[in-house]
Amino acid sequence: MKKVMTKEGVELRVEDSIIYTTDSKAFWRSGNMLIGNGKAMSYTCRSMDEAVDIVAALYGGKA
């Protein structure tokens, strides 16, 4: 399990292909798609590291 802190103080917790946030949201990667907030956020997400960067950007980026 990997943890990443964002500039807005929200912690991202990565477990397998799912990213959980401390503000009770979840994002997941399926193939090249990153899904969260009820919609596809990216159709070209190539790795979990890239997925974490995209989600962290929603919270001001990595701290």
Predicted regions and their residues:
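Short amphipathic alpha-helical segments that mediate assembly, nucleic-acid/protein binding
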Residues: 11-12, 26, 48-52
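Mixed-charge, Lys/Arg-enriched low-complexity segments
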Residues: 4, 34-63
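Negatively charged, low-complexity tracts enriched in Asp/Glu with abundant Ser/Thr
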Residues: 1-20
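Serine/threonine-rich, low-complexity intrinsically disordered segments
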Residues: 8, 20-24, 46, 56
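Short aromatic-glycine-(Arg/Gly/Cys) micro-motifs in beta-strand/loop hairpins
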Residues: 14-40
